[in-house]
Amino acid sequence: MKYRKFIILVLSILIILPVSTLDGHHIANADDDSPKKLKYKENSALALNYHRVRKANFLNNFIYFFSSSKEIKNYSVSQSQFESQIKWLKSHDAKFLTLKEFLYYKKKGKFPKRSVWINFDDMDETIYENAYPILKKYKIPATGFIITGHVGEENFHNLDMISKKELKEMYKTGLWEFETHTHDLHNLSKNNKSKLMKASEATIIKDLNKSEKYLTKNFKKSQKTIAYPYGLMNDDKLPVIKKAGLKYGFSLEEKAVTPNSNDYYIPRILISDDAFEHLIKRWDGFHEKD
């Protein structure tokens, strides 16, 4: 009887998950399921972006294997996959950068070889529970882009968000920096239009100022950066971002970062297990001689 109930539960989850994620999060940039090899340029860095780090248990692995949900396939890695990726980067002499260092080298015009900047969007509980311990173990710096108006919220687009207490614990390690992912403009409309892209100038400026104030008060935020919800931004809205006082913006795109990358369209590579295998491991920057 217990086995039968378990199967029914799993099947129900598999039916519900592809539907529920359509309303909530990251369908906008999950169209390409076949990562291609990254073009390599000397003097470049990799910005590796994560969203979910799943617990590697039987149920999660079962759901991952059988689900057709792009939210699960493209926007998450398991805890074991994440640790394997970190260990692979370390074994290939990656130079792990803080956000401050990353921006410094970009502005200076010269990245150290094999530069890697680890960052996370949304900051839900899976990051605290499954990624944070690994980064702490290996002493790897990271940046979290926080939806500041939903810190500690349960069931935000089917996600439980990290609490302020947990964020402060992470910050005190000296390994974490926190930046804005908006205060309350992270949503998709029914036609997959970003709430940020639809908002008025006054609404955007008010929202970003509120987010900046929260981050400055709690985490001494100083880098003036934003990770755009869903990685989406266009030239029509960009003047508003600048008017709000932000100096750098991060998108989602399968490209390495160079000093010449536009400061408001800095590409980050969305990491799944497939993306790491096909893009990161094959990047020529890890295979060139010093």
From Swiss-Prot:
GO molecular function terms noted in the UniProt entry: hydrolase activity; hydrolase activity, acting on carbon-nitrogen (but not peptide) bonds, in linear amides
Subcellular location: Secreted, Cell wall
The protein's Enzyme Commission number: 3.5.1.-
Annotated PROSITE patterns: NODB
Keyword Hydrolase attached: yes
Positions of the NodB homology domain: 114-290
GO BP terms, alphabetized: carbohydrate metabolic process
Description of the deletion phenotype: Deletion of the icaADBCR genes leads to the inability to form biofilms, produce PIA or mediate N-acetylglucosaminyltransferase activity in vitro.
Signal peptide boundaries: 1-28
Keywords, sorted A to Z: Cell wall, Hydrolase, Secreted, Signal
InterPro entries per record: Glyco_hydro/deAcase_b/a-brl (IPR011330), NODB_dom (IPR002509), PNAG_deacetylase (IPR023872), Polysacch_Deacetylase (IPR051398)
Coiled-coil blocks: none
Enzyme class (EC, first level): hydrolase
GO cellular component terms given for this protein: extracellular region
Pfam families to which the protein is assigned, alphabetical: Polysacc_deac_1
Protein family membership: Belongs to the polysaccharide deacetylase family.
Protein purpose: Catalyzes the N-deacetylation of poly-beta-1,6-N-acetyl-D-glucosamine (PNAG, also referred to as PIA), a biofilm adhesin polysaccharide. N-deacetylation is crucial for attachment of the polysaccharide to the bacterial cell surface; it leads to the introduction of positive charges in the otherwise neutral PIA polymer, allowing electrostatic interactions.
Record NCBIfam families: PIA_icaB
Name of this protein: Poly-beta-1,6-N-acetyl-D-glucosamine N-deacetylase
